[in-house]
Design a protein with these regions (language model features):
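Replication-associated primase and helicase/ATPase modules
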Residues: 1-9, 13-19, 121-124, 131-138, ...
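TOPRIM metal-binding catalytic domain and adjacent DNA-binding surface shared by DnaG-type primases
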Residues: 1-47
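Phosphate-handling DNA/RNA-contact segment within nucleic-acid enzymes
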Residues: 39-121, 126-163
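Acidic beta-strand-to-loop metal/phosphate-binding motif
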Residues: 96, 168-177
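Acidic, metal-coordinating catalytic cores used for nucleic-acid/nucleotide bond scission
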Residues: 150-154, 174-183
Length: 184
């Protein structure tokens, strides 16, 4: 049975770890925290990355140690891999990663080039490669979809495709090691 790790009463260690040690952009991090997708566990002060179904019910919790001496990574007992940590956007783009940190790092590094303005024609796209959200005039990183498999599984990918019929373009952003390349 899936149970969420109890939350700590503050997120000091999580903010220090993600902002200072991992270099996650504060606006990107705050967007996920605001949606209650990231929190700090009470017992071990791990960062917890939550995955929800389309009705907003949590079904997956990936945990990552935050202390400088910790290499702990794992999923909470009963986590359903189809609903691992992900962000649903409205564009036709999905970026799939192995780990939540990889996903947040990518968004932090590229959030400006993931934006597109139909008026200026600027952004990380070429003429024949425009995202669906440009019909609304402007895209930001929030308009795209992102998922972290919390492994090299394809289960969250197929769940995202099932839940988001607008997705037409998938970028697999797995590590360049043997497991990542075999899965890709």
């Amino acid at each position: 049975k899936f149970e969420l790790p109890p939350a700590n009463d503050n997120m000091r260690r999580v903010f220090a770890y993600l902002l200072n040690r991992r270099g996650i952009d504060k606006d990107v991090l705050y967007a996920f925290v605001h949606k209650k997708m990231i929190y700090e566990s009470a017992q071990y002060h791990n960062v917890v990355f939550l995955g929800f179904d389309k009705d907003g019910i949590p079904h997956h919790a990936n945990k990552r140690g935050t202390s400088s001496s910790s290499t702990y990574k794992g999923n909470a007992v009963g986590s359903v891999p189809e609903y691992s940590f992900h962000w649903n956007g409205k564009s036709d783009r999905l970026y799939l990663f192995e780990a939540p940190i990889d996903m947040l790092s990518f968004i932090s590094l590229y959030h400006k080039s993931l934006a597109f303005s139909a008026e200026s024609g600027k952004g990380g796209y070429t003429a024949g490669n425009l995202p669906d959200c440009t019909k609304f005039g402007r895209c930001t990183w929030r308009d795209h979809s992102y998922a972290a498999a919390c492994s090299v599984s394809d289960k969250v990918l197929f769940q995202c495709l099932h839940d988001n019929s607008n997705i037409r373009n998938v970028s697999i952003c797995f590590d360049s090691d043997e497991p990542g390349q075999l899965a890709a």
